[in-house]
Design a protein with these regions (language model features):
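N-terminal, intrinsically disordered charge-dense segments
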Residues: 43-46, 50, 55, 62
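Gly/Ser/Thr-rich active-site loops/lids in small-molecule metabolic enzymes
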Residues: 237-285
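ATP/NTP phosphate-donor binding region
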Residues: 53, 65-134, 175-190, 201-211
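Short glycine/serine/threonine-rich phosphate/pyrophosphate-binding segments
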Residues: 87-88, 142-148, 255-261
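Gly/Ser-rich helix-loop-strand patches that form or flank binding pockets
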Residues: 151-161, 168
Length: 285
């Protein structure tokens, strides 16, 4: 799916980390207090912790969300990042429809640059909590993933209008905005739960990176074309040591993305599990 996924974890550059549950045992020397999965590569520790964020809701006729207990949505925030005519057209159409239904509409800063909208109705993303009941993302799956990661802690629901290619997560057609969005505004949706990976990287006892991932985390040597050696621990228990091109750790949501391309299995989105897929392993001990 689109950037910033998959996150690249490089021993040389150390960008992002990973996620799981709490653990009672750690690999010797592991400074991490997170539980779940640890990947150890020389002096670098990549810790993964499963976060109990509910990650999705589905409209009964399908749509992608981060859950909420609200049955009705009055204040709607519009998000978009792709500066293409199709996105601008859908934003204008969506805005007109929401206003016709008596909803209050605000634009996230990047989306506001694509349309003519009053300055007092523009909000940065970090001010959405408490200001909007529902976020609607116009774009592709990557736009939805980015918004989901940014807004996960706030639990603001997200609905996707597809202006990308695949539309796994943003599967409402621009031609069906009125037909598909109106039932959601009235509370006609079904909630499903998905989790997110919380990630951190520690080197020489110092935290050097952390983040969230809806799809997957990838351990990779970066731009260098070489194999890397590492050990994998789950809940503090040694699983294996490996030399390979890297490792993918994916959520069930992300099992349809990079992990699938690397030969991993497809998981039911609601399954409480993770996919671990080695990239071209040379050894597995």
């Amino acid at each position: 799916m689109l950037a910033p996924y998959p996150a690249i974890l490089s021993e040389a550059e150390g960008s992002f980390g990973m996620s799981h549950r709490e653990r009672s045992k750690r690999p010797e020397g592991d400074p991490s207090t997170a539980v779940g999965m640890t990947v150890r590569s020389t002096v670098t520790y990549y810790a993964l912790k499963r976060v109990n964020y509910c990650a999705t809701l589905y409209n009964r006729r399908t749509g992608f969300w981060i859950p909420s207990n609200m049955a009705h949505f009055q204040r709607i925030g519009l998000l978009a990042s792709l500066d293409v005519p199709e996105v601008r057209d859908s934003l204008n159409k969506l805005e007109a429809f929401l206003l016709s239904q008596g909803r209050e509409v605000v634009y996230e800063e990047r989306a506001a640059k694509l349309v003519d909208w009053p300055v007092d109705k523009i909000l940065p993303l970090d001010q959405f909590p408490g200001a909007v009941d529902l976020g609607i993302v116009v774009g592709g799956d990557g736009s939805m993933l980015s918004a989901s990661r940014s807004m996960a802690a706030s639990k603001i629901p997200l609905l996707g209008i597809n202006r990308g290619r695949l539309g796994f997560l943003t599967d409402i057609s621009p031609d069906e905005i009125a037909e598909r969005v109106l039932p959601v505004l009235s509370g006609d949706y079904k909630q499903t739960n998905r989790f997110i990976l919380e990630t951190s990287i520690t080197r020489h006892g110092k935290l050097i990176g952390e983040g969230l991932a809806v799809n997957d985390i990838v351990l990779h040597p970066g731009q260098s074309v070489r194999m890397m050696a590492f050990e994998l621990y789950v809940d503090g228990e040694f699983v294996y040591s490996q030399r390979s091109d890297g490792l993918i750790v994916a959520t069930p949501t992300g099992s349809t993305a990079y992990a699938l391309s690397a030969g991993g299995p497809l998981l039911c989105p609601e399954l409480d599990a993770m996919v671990v897929v080695p990239l071209n392993p040379h050894t597995l001990n």
